[in-house]
């Protein structure tokens, strides 16, 4: 009887594991790349409009959790199944492919859940 109960609970355990995997967060830190022209405004940079459209799509898909800028670094927190998936997703951005920006991607492990207004 105990084995039957365990067998019946197994699918619930597997679903729970998948949900946890879906909840992984990663931080992407953007800096300007070799294509960036310091004599041009951001909107005048090659591939900048495409970059903005790419990030807009990720926001609409609820992939981006939040974004911020500090100094010359842009930061987004995004959801992905694993680090490799996060990197692969971000490198679909034509601005990264053409080195308008550089990006570093790291696991983002929350230790304090605050709130933003």
Predicted regions located by residue number:
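Bacterial Sec-dependent N-terminal signal peptides
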Residues: 1-21
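Conserved, structured core segments of small domains
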Residues: 17-117
